[in-house]
């Protein structure tokens, strides 16, 4: 063994030893992971994510993956010649769009992630299980309504978003059954819900992750994004903030665009029983491991 290889071995051992207190903290705890962004479409990054999810399972953590798929849906709609329209960051979903969204989310993406996890965990028999919120009526949903002011009359008008929904009830029993099984399963959830009348709805993946994390009383919810975390007015990373500070960031306008719904869902999750939510860069290799098993973490932690 060369000196360089030997030093690398000692460094690895040191890292593992330093991680021991954190491994014990998360032993048999549920961690909900919102997996999305452009990194999800990169095969090498997807393989690293799957391997890290398997490692979490083998270290005693109960990971639950909720995935998005906006860019993939947009590409499929473009191929089908269906135009996409967005209101407040939500895709207006008519019948044709809903059919494509469910096919992409519950079919292609969901099964691909579950398969990567199963391949990564093959030697230890860790298996990814792909589900949508329709399975076992895990996610009961209702239609989302939005209003906006008419520029001419300044009157609030209802905007029809089509088959865009929001969770009204979460039944976590099927997930809990998988997590407590003798086989090491990792549930992978597509953000599709169903109404009490049987209507299918497309739901924002951040919203689903927050609702599931609350129902499962998860210790952590990790929101993997394309940025380092939440930034302050000067563009610097905020390492930790309270729910009150997160609200203030929204109200002041410092948080804008896609960060607003992420913060809103993080606030909702914490207020519904999740110990803390972390927004972090999912493009960085092993970001989840650094966040959970090191002193300083890897993103912005939001707690009470």
From Swiss-Prot:
Q: Where does the UniProt entry say this protein principally localizes? A: cytoplasm
Q: Which GO terms describe its molecular function?
A: acetylglutamate kinase activity; ATP binding
Cite the binding residues for substrate.
69-70, 91, 202
Reactions the enzyme catalyzes: N-acetyl-L-glutamate + ATP = N-acetyl-L-glutamyl 5-phosphate + ADP
Name the residues annotated as site: Transition state stabilizer.
34, 262
Q: Which NCBIfam families match?
A: argB
**PANTHER family named in the record:** N-ACETYLGLUTAMATE SYNTHASE, N-ACETYLGLUTAMATE SYNTHASE, MITOCHONDRIAL
Describe the family membership recorded for this protein in Swiss-Prot or TrEMBL.
Answer: Belongs to the acetylglutamate kinase family. ArgB subfamily.
User: What is the recorded name of this protein?
Assistant: Acetylglutamate kinase
| Species of origin | Caulobacter sp. (strain K31)
Q: Which gene encodes it?
A: argB
